[in-house]
Regions:
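Residue-level recognition of tetratricopeptide repeat
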Residues: 88, 122, 155-158, 220, ...
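Start-of-helix register in tetratricopeptide repeats
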Residues: 81, 98, 115, 149-151, ...
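N-terminal secretory signal peptides and thylakoid transit peptides that target proteins
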Residues: 43-58
Length: 266
């Protein structure tokens, strides 16, 4: 099995292990919280909100549909959730542009979902459409004022936008996040000092989820601040963690996509 197929299979397996997941608040169909398990829960008893919910069988159907009908016809046949999952499947396989096409169809066919399409924002970031990505994430924060990750990703888009650049003052203010690793990540992006970096590094010792997210967001911070070498070391290390290789978390796939887009060997 090829590496992209293996990654997608793990995401599918992660989805299959879910049981009775509930969303924290109204979001896109795929933003549900999977049931906790010893292998995926963090020190706070939390699981990542970005768990990829690619239902078994959806990927094969998506692949068939993508070659058998034009986008407008596929949109008429696919429910919003299937379009979203198909876009996520494409992203996992590093087909960023293809994922955007599906996510745009979701917004076109269900405009009410636009503020909740965090997946679209991530794809726009990797397509280097930073202004559009920042706008997507800020729409999310507007309806979810405690959304720490979207605030960080809006900042990351701004930092790479040549018209804006790195400016910590642009970090959107949000409420408290229940996940310790995301609170520490937000503190690093907000303060930008050595103490905050050490605090996020220390979180890594609390569990597999914490370790992965600590490495990922410390790496993303360094890249935003212009330290490409430091970013590479940390994000590549994140892709090699036990959690990244076993969980099927969408953000674990994102870390791999990040490395591929930057030309970093994992």
């Amino acid at each position: 099995m090829s590496a992209p197929a293996t990654t997608t299979a793990r995401v599918l397996a992660f989805s299959a292990r879910r049981s009775n997941g509930e969303t924290r608040r109204p979001r896109a169909p795929t933003r549900a919280t999977p049931a906790s398990s010893s292998s995926t829960s963090s020190s706070d008893g939390e699981v990542p909100r970005r768990a990829a919910l690619l239902a078994p069988g959806v990927l094969a159907a998506a692949a068939a549909a993508s070659v058998s009908a034009p986008p407008t016809a596929r949109a008429a046949l696919d429910p919003t959730s299937s379009l979203t999952r198909r876009g996520m499947a494409k992203f996992v396989q590093n087909d960023v542009e293809g994922s955007i096409a599906d996510f745009d169809l979701v917004v076109q066919n269900a405009p009410r979902m636009e503020p909740y399409m965090w997946q679209r924002g991530l794809s726009l970031y990797y397509a280097e459409r930073y202004e559009d990505g920042a706008a997507q994430f800020r729409k999310d924060v507007a309806v979810n004022p405690n959304d720490t990750e979207e605030a960080i990703w809006a900042f990351l888009c701004d930092a790479r936008d040549p018209k804006i650049g790195f400016d910590r003052a642009r970090l959107t203010r949000v409420g408290p996040d229940p996940r310790r690793y995301m609170r520490a990540a937000y503190d690093l992006f907000n303060a930008g000092d050595a103490a905050s970096d050490v605090a996020l590094e220390d979180v890594a010792s609390l569990g597999p989820v914490d370790e992965f997210y600590s490495l990922l967001y410390r790496g993303l911070w360094r890249e935003a601040a212009g330290d490409a070498a430091g970013a590479r070391d940390l994000i590549v290390e994140a892709t090699r963690t036990q959690y990244a290789n076993r969980s099927g978390d969408y953000m674990a796939a994102l870390a791999v996509v990040h490395c591929k887009r930057r030309g970093w060997a994992t």
